[in-house]
Amino acid sequence: MSAIEQVSRPYAASFVEFARNRREVLCLSADLTNSVEIDDFKKVCPDRFISCGLSEQAMMGVAGGLAREGLLPYVHTFAVFVTRRPYDQVAMSIAYPNLRVHLMGFLPGLTTPGGVTHQAIDDIALMRVLPNMTVVDCGDATDVESVLDATEDVDGPVYCRILRGRVPRLFREPLELGRARVLESGDDVCLFTSSVCTGEAMPAVAALRAKGLSIGHVHVSTLKPFTDPAVLEAVGAARRGVISLENHLVTGGLGSSLAELMAEQAIGHRLVRMGLYDTYAHGGSLSYLLEYYGLSARHVVDAVERLTGERFGIELERAAESEGAPSTEKAEAL
C-alpha cells in the first residue's frame, strides 16, 4: 500500500483562498485563532476578522446579527464549544430564524487528548436534531479543502466538523454536499464510515476483500440531509448486514442515521453500530483511543466476523499509529 500523503493545515490555506475575495465573508474567533487555523486569514484580511473572546454564547448572537444584515459569518472554535456550550444560542439565534451562519468545529470526537472537556462526542446528535441545520463531517484533507465551496450556497445554517494539523489525503475528488463516497462496492457486507474512521478502516476493508469477502465501503460526509440514493443502494445490496463506524457516540450520529433509513425503507438487514457506547472518553493519542474504545481496524475485522459468523484469519497491528490519522500535535490551545 502506497504511503498516504499528509497535508499540513489544509483548512488554513483553503479558508484564505475561499474568503479573500468574498467581501461578505466574516471570520469569527473565540480566542483560539492559531488553534483553529485562522491565523493566516487574520493577517491577510484583518478588517474582516472579529475576535469575540472566550464567549461562545455571545459569539453565536453576533453571528446571527451579522447574517441578518446580509453578511456571511464563519464561526470558528473547537467542536465542543460550537455545540454543547452555546447550544441554546445556536438554536434560537441561528437555527430557528434559518440564518446563513457557518459553524466550523475543530477537534471532533476523539481527535484530541484533552479529555472530556474538549472531546465533542455528541455534537452530531445535537446538531442533527436542530431544524434547518445542515451537518457535514470531514474525513480527510480533500474534504477539509472543499467543504467551504460545497456548503457556501446552503440557504440556512451549516455545522462542519473540521480536521486540523497534519491531515491525510484519502480522496482526490472534492466533497459534494449530500453525496457519499462509494470507495468499494460489495454484496456481502457494507461498512459505512465517517471522519477519521474512514482512514482507519481502509486496511481492514482491503484485508477482508483479499480474503474473498465482498465488502463494500462507503465514506459519509453529509450527515444531514441523509438522503443520498447511493447510501440506500449500498445498504440494500449488503445481504449479510451493515456496519457503521464513527468518531462519535453510536446514538444520534451515523449509526442512528442508517438505522432510521433502514427502518423507514423496511430493509431488514442486521446493523452493527461501532462507536462510543453511552460513555465519555478519556485523554490519549488518537490511535490509543480508537483501540481502547473498539474503533480500530482490527475491531472492524472482529465486527465483520461476528456479523458473518466466519473467521478470516486476519491479523492487524494492535494500537499501531495509523497512517490515516491526523497528528495530536498541539492538540490543545494553551
Show where each model-derived region lies.
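Thiamine diphosphate
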Residues: 1-161, 166-167, 179, 312, ...
